[in-house]
């Protein structure tokens, strides 16, 4: 189960706490935190560390190796086999052959599973190693004087006075006391690629109607980072009490079951229930008919072992391990083995936008005049504005400066003054001169704020008053750019006489608007190809992002993702689960989503029967990564995102996901081969045993013969993980269906019984094995026919095509099945055969055997064709 504190409750509590302190006067806030502007002393720091603990966000740690080893035994088939081995050991302590055979198979399966999981967890733990950071704080020394020092982030406490500069990671949840031109990147929390401005509460920053804690302009959150500017702040919360920590707490506890877990569990219990019903029936029939209850009991135990697909854990683990190795060659770390299979079952991939569909790099897409036509003049004015500002340039300034080299233009000017960007104005200005008798004030900023300070508009050589009608035209033009997913800044200028006066905000008036700059985080070249490939293989792609809707829709259209409908986080918040379930089917883009809302969408898709993959790298993605059937992250992701993921990509490339999907389907297909082969063979064998037990005066096969036959058959299955899958099987998602397995058993299982009974008739009537004195001949004949038919079923079931002619198994499968068939035919002629009660067979038997097996293959192919036509699937 999940942690008892719901994500929604944690987020609400974080919002409430942050809001209470966001606009409180600094002196009042410091008093409430028992702090002061010159910092805390050592006694207060020690007391708070003892009270609150170190400033660290807890994360999952791999279980001790002994616990992982015990977990490897937590499989119903393993438990059943161990119980059968113990019962057989106590029933017949003189014969250890049966328990030893069972013990060997259990040991191999458990050790292989444990080894692979342990290695994967160790590799993942290395990826999750946290980087040690420091923070700059003001603290009081022993003599009472304040000093600015560097301390490990883990040693921060509530009330510490922290100093921030460009490039710093926010070390805890902070309330700003003072700030200058402070821009914070919250991308790891929101997915938004552009930084947001933060400021201390003063005349420029008023309380705003925030929809969540991340919208508070006076609060900075642990895990985000400073893009530009400086600030002084006080620590509000540390460690688990931070917003980041609240997300980490929602990730504690056991994970929800994935489709793989649910599928294996349902298949396991289906086969166990079948065994629990059939074994007592076999025991009673033989006990009543032959009056040897001990012999009947031992025979029943052997049948139980034969019905138990003890190789399932081994086959599953080997398949997943092989898939993990194949993925590692593609620069993918598989943290949890069952995620490989879930790749194949995945029919919906939810992905973020930034860095996945896009380059995660702001570029200047267009520079236009006020009519929306391309304009180099707008670019030149924008270039001068970005070039001559003295503060740390933001991403859009860098995009302007790298768009085109206009240094030759800039070299004609020198800086006179500047008016820095601030939160309220949402614009910045520079004043430059070319050395002649005038100065130029060049301003760029947000559309509405710029239109308020402009009185004229220039398009080409035409200058006209900026009337209300003209403002509406400019707004309509910029809105069209917004709808194309572009972020728009307006550029304006004013010519002033040369002078030595200082410029201020009041000078930003009477400007002439000259054009617009439009920015875009461009799509990756590989994104469109990858989306087409995923769609071709039956995987629908949905975008879940913290970015705005217009930008996301534009990017989706450019990468060929058809947006049938879109929704925003505020829309999701108003829906109950039933309404959300209906919405997620037809919605392609989910924008402005919070972490809790992302997880809700994933769960809604799962309730609709989808197997969901989620690709994300931010802290805001962690709950959804954990709840998805397969969580995918990248090695540059936040620690919480990497912990929550099942798979970590060393390159954030959607093409790797297509390869993972195909690898997962191969893995799933090979697992299903074993399950359906075993289930149908076991069903047919039990039916044959029931018929033989009812009519024969002796056991149709000795218990030890059953165990040897079962071991040989199991060995023939070891090559299945190395088999190939037909191309048509890989085209669509493959999911677990326990009902289909039961149906498959009933349809295909009796086919082998038909030829088992034919063999009984031949051995009884043609070869005279019709009395207890000749039972070894009868048992030898059925042993070989049963083993060869079970081994041939590998080739019959592995493909929906005609085996050997239109679909040939891989070399390992051909080699191992052929070897087992040869060994099986030689056993009656060996010392082992004599020891387990078998005898050589006459040569004519093998002619009949060849005819029987040929007819068996033909009838199985006929039943396969009928089954596929009726139910539309095979594996």
Please tell me what each predicted stretch does.
Residues 52-138, 240-242, 248-329, 339, ...:
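Hydrophobic alpha-helical segments characteristic of transmembrane helices
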């Amino acid at each position: 189960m999940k942690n008892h504190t719901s994500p929604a409750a944690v987020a609400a509590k974080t919002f409430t706490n942050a809001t209470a302190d966001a606009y409180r006067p600094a002196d009042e806030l410091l008093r409430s935190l028992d702090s002061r502007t010159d910092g805390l002393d050592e006694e207060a720091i020690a007391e708070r560390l003892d009270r609150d603990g170190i400033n660290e966000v807890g994360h999952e740690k791999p279980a001790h190796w002994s616990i992982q080893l015990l977990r490897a035994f937590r499989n119903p088939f393993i438990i059943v086999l161990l119980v059968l081995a113990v019962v057989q050991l106590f029933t017949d302590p003189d014969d250890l052959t049966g328990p030893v055979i069972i013990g060997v198979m259990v040991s191999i399966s458990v050790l292989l599973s444990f080894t692979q999981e342990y290695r994967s967890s160790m590799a993942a733990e290395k990826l999750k190693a946290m980087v040690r950071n420091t923070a700059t704080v003001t603290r009081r020394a022993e003599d009472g004087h304040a000093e600015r020092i560097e301390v490990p982030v883990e040693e921060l406490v509530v009330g510490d006075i922290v100093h921030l500069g460009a490039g710093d990671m926010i070390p805890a949840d902070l309330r700003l006391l003072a700030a200058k031109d402070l821009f914070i990147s919250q991308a790891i929390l929101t997915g938004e690629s552009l930084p947001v401005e933060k400021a201390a509460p003063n005349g420029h920053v008023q309380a705003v109607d925030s929809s969540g804690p991340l919208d508070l302009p006076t609060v900075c959150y642990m895990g985000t980072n400073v893009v530009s500017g400086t600030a002084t702040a006080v620590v509000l919360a540390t460690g688990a009490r931070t917003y980041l920590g609240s997300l980490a707490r929602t990730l504690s506890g056991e994970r929800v079951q994935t489709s793989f877990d649910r599928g294996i569990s349902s298949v396991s219990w289906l086969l166990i229930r079948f065994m629990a019903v059939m074994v007592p029936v076999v025991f009673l029939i033989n006990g009543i008919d032959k009056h040897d209850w001990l012999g009947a009991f031992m025979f029943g135990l052997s049948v139980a072992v034969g019905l138990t697909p003890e190789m399932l854990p081994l086959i599953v683990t080997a398949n997943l391990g092989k898939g993990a190795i194949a993925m590692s060659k593609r620069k993918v770390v598989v943290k949890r083995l069952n995620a490989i299979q879930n790749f194949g079952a995945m029919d919906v991939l939810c992905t973020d936008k930034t860095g996945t569909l896009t380059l995660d790099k702001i570029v200047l897409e267009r520079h236009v005049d006020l009519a929306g036509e391309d304009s180099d003049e707008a670019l030149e004015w924008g270039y001068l504005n970005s070039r001559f500002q003295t503060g740390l340039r933001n991403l859009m300034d860098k995009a302007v400066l790298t768009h085109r080299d206009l240094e030759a233009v800039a070299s004609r000017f020198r800086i006179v003054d500047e008016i820095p960007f601030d939160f309220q104005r949402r614009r910045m200005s520079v004043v430059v001169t070319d050395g002649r008798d005038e100065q130029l004030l060049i301003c760029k900023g947000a559309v509405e704020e710029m239109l308020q300070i402009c009185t004229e508009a220039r398009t080409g050589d035409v200058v006209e008053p900026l009337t209300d009608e003209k403002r509406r035209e400019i707004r309509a033009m910029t809105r069209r750019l917004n709808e194309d997913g572009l972020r728009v800044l307006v550029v304006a200028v004013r010519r002033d006489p040369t002078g030595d006066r200082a410029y201020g905000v009041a000078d930003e008036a009477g400007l002439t608007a000259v054009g617009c700059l439009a920015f875009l985080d461009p799509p990756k070249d590989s994104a469109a190809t990858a989306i087409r490939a995923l769609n071709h293989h039956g995987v629908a792609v949905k975008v879940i992002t913290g970015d705005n809707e217009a930008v996301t829709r534009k990017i989706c259209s450019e990468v060929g993702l058809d947006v049938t409908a879109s929704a925003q986080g505020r829309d999701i918040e108003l829906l109950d689960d039933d309404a959300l379930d209906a919405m997620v089917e037809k919605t392609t883009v989910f924008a402005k989503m919070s972490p809790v809302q992302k997880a809700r969408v994933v769960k809604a898709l799962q309730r609709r029967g989808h197997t969901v993959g989620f690709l994300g790298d931010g802290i805001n993605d962690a709950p959804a990564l954990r709840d998805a059937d397969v969580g995918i992250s990248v090695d540059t992701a936040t620690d919480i995102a990497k912990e929550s993921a099942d798979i970590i990509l060393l390159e954030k490339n959607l093409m790797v996901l297509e390869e993972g999907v195909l690898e997962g389907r191969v893995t799933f297909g090979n697992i299903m081969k074993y399950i359906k082969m075993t289930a149908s063979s076991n069903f047919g064998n039990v039916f044959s045993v029931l018929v033989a037990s009812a009519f024969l005066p002796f056991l149709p096969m000795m218990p030890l013969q059953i165990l040897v036959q079962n071991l040989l058959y199991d060995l023939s299955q070891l090559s299945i993980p190395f088999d190939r899958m037909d191309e048509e099987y890989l085209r669509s998602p493959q999911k677990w269906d326990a009902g289909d397995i039961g149906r498959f058993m009933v349809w295909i299982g009796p086919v082998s019984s038909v030829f088992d009974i034919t063999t009984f008739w031949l051995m009884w009537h043609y070869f005279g094995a019709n009395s207890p004195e000749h039972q070894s001949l009868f048992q030898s004949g059925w042993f070989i026919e049963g083993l060869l038919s079970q081994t041939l079923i590998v080739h019959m079931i592995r493909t929906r095509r005609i085996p050997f002619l239109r679909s040939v198994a891989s070399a390992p499968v051909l080699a191992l099945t052929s070897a087992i068939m040869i060994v099986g035919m030689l056993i009656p002629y060996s010392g082992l055969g004599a020891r387990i009660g078998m005898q050589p067979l006459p040569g004519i038997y093998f002619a009949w055997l060849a005819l029987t097996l040929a007819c068996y293959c033909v009838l199985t192919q006929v039943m396969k064709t009928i089954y596929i036509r009726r139910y539309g699937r095979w594996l």
